[in-house]
Amino acid sequence: MSTHGAQVAGLVRRFPDPEKRCGTAPAVAVWRIAKSLVLLRCRSSPMGIVDIGGALAHADLRTPLGLGLYRYGFRTIESRVLVGLLRRDDVVIDGGANIGLFSLLAAATVGPSGRVIACEPSPRTMALLNANANLNGFDVIERHEVALSDQPGTASFVVFDNASGLASFAPGLDGGKVIEVNTATLDDLTARLSAPVAVLKLDVEGAEVKALRGARSMLGRDLPLVLLEVEPGHLGRQGSSVEDLRQTLHPLGYEAYAIRGDARLVKITGPWQPAPAASPNLVLAPAARADRIESLRTPV
């Protein structure tokens, strides 16, 4: 990014919500001018910079993800839930980090004394993740170019040119390119942490069960809250099922919560399935972390 672009990005980052932070007219004016310059830059370049609420992100306007980010911002149901689960100084894992949007929000929430461990196996996507972390000066984001699995090694991985978030272990969706990537377990990645993992976010296109099986020691030790995607079709392509997911976590005392359209959590008393037409994700919470979800739960 040019020097001018870096200065503009710095201004936007400094005043993400100036009316709440200081309320001064000059600050509001600077913020509006800086944001306008960023938008002007986006229109003349395939790469833009977008304020996602608490952080900035590069948006590749040549891709559906980047274009959607530029047009609509990034305030998803899942991002609201993630921020609601986190506390200052937390350790959080972003498995299947893609370009790092959840990692950025997590870093902004946990602060400089927290830690974010971001895992993304696609080299092209990791390059954007690195750029996003550097854009914000988020040194707390520890980045690993690996796919999470139940054992370390290498594996065939299907990636897409548009950083769509659909990359997965082979076999994957049609239209992708197969590459070899390194795999790692969460137990290995977290073995030397000095603080417990508070929140684990997983969106690994059907490999969630593999990732959790590679995290048995960490899960039993830290009992983190888990936010993960549950797509039966994706799980089936990777040789697992929703029941496998339940059998992996339920013995550790985890209860499942569906996510409503208003980002509230509803306890699931039957099969572990997401709420229809809301979010394809579940929050899985052990009793030891029940206090973290109280503010997000619907009244009984």
Model-derived features: where do they sit?
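S-adenosyl-L-methionine
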Residues: 1-132, 136, 140, 173, ...
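Short internal loop-to-helix segment that lines adenine-nucleotide cofactor pockets
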Residues: 71-91, 138-142, 154-156, 164, ...
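Active-site flanking residues adjacent to catalytic metal/cofactor-binding acidic residues
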Residues: 93, 119, 200-202, 228
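A short, conserved beta-to-alpha structural element at the edge of catalytic cores
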Residues: 121-125, 223-237
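Core alpha/beta nucleotide-donor-binding catalytic domains of modification enzymes
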Residues: 123-126, 130-164
